[in-house]
């Protein structure tokens, strides 16, 4: 569309140049007089005006291109900003939906509690007192359990100690080297008895 418009402008503005070319070619076939020279000057003036208009048109087109490029950059920047804002809004929407879902869950959980109604201050103090008594009882039971456990551990350690002592008395540790030395000594004192014993065995 724009190319067609440009071509139509150039087609219209080509006329002064064509007239000048035609007149210059006509000078070769006829004599040049003052009237023809004035006509030629007029054609040159028209051509100069044509070039001036063409230059102005080119300058105007360049300005239009600059304006168009500026508008294009603004539009692109605006589109990028809009995309970023849309993405942020989508994230905010997801967060809001998640918060709404949690609130609905909290409301469902709170309905049974709220349906019972709020207790009076006296009832709350009584409940707190009962809880404190229960805590004290549990602490006392824990302390007694620790004492009993320590006592049983001491008794077990003492019993184990006594058993080890009794075992050392009933079964004293033997020394293999001393037993072998005693056997050799007894054989040295009675060699005949040892040999006779071997002979009988044979």
UniProtKB/Swiss-Prot annotation:
Main location: cytoplasm
A single GO BP: RNA splicing
Primary gene name: tho7
Similarity comment: Belongs to the THOC7 family.
Assembly mode: Component of the THO and TREX complexes.
Protein name: THO complex subunit tho7
Provenance organism: Schizosaccharomyces pombe (strain 972 / ATCC 24843) (Fission yeast)
Coiled-coil ranges per UniProt: 53-151
The organism's taxonomic lineage, starting at the top: Eukaryota, Fungi, Dikarya, Ascomycota, Taphrinomycotina
Function: Component the THO subcomplex of the TREX complex, which operates in coupling transcription elongation to mRNA export. The THO complex is recruited to transcribed genes and moves along the gene with the elongating polymerase during transcription. THO is important for stabilizing nascent RNA in the RNA polymerase II elongation complex by preventing formation of DNA:RNA hybrids behind the elongating polymerase. The THO complex is also required to maintain TRAMP complex occupancy at sites of snoRNA transcription thus promoting exosome-mediated degradation of snoRNA precursors.
Pfam families: THOC7
Phenotypic consequence of gene deletion: Results in increased levels of H/ACA box and C/D box snoRNAs.
Region called Disordered, residue ranges: 166-202
Disulfide bridge map: none
Compartmental location: Cytoplasm; Nucleus
GO CC entries: cytosol; nucleus; THO complex part of transcription export complex
